[in-house]
């Protein structure tokens, strides 16, 4: 997850998607690369919910803090056993070195963006950094915009999709609506309500992976084939989604 500014939904997207991928049967690692530590704080607060037994049920996957300028060198060893690695990056404008290191690691870079002219305009510096980082990679990462905080039945979502397409962005087919269940979810266990949207987002990301892509994107019995995992390295999905040289998916 990458963006120029804070407050664009990177942490919310990373946490909800991590729950979706683990629910589908994947081994998931959530990397909090933001010095503010919002994802790690969310996990800690959610574990205090008295309704949970055991506390680790709040976030049924590993969460590690790695706000490092050499994240792309250190993370492969940490993520070696994981199917999906999701990196919650800091804003580029204040922590460029850390964010760029994450961009060097990820296979797919997801840019959360509200359907507003100012946020669409701010995607341009992100794309410029992605292009620059590509020179330091063996092959360029995929990148796509995730429209979020969309108002139901408003023209702004379609207008934003059209504007981004005119700028040659890939835009994920699923748009995340502006709902209280997402806005108020920080610090709490992620509820069942509202997950279907994120399942569709996960499916959109998996659809973008070059085959074979063994990462599951839905509930058990409704996922992509994983047989190829035995014989082929796994692709990395990002922003949601980086991965290790062994081939995990990293958004």
Where are the regions a protein language model picked out?
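Beta-strand-loop-alpha "switch" segments that mediate conformational coupling across diverse proteins
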Residues: 149-190
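P-loop/Walker-type NTP enzyme "switch/lid" segment
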Residues: 2-8, 15-96, 100, 186-191
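Hydrophobic anchor at the start of a short beta-strand
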Residues: 27-28, 85, 109, 141-143, ...
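Long, low-complexity, intrinsically disordered segments
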Residues: 226-251
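C-terminal boundary of histidine-terminating zinc-finger modules
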Residues: 184-203
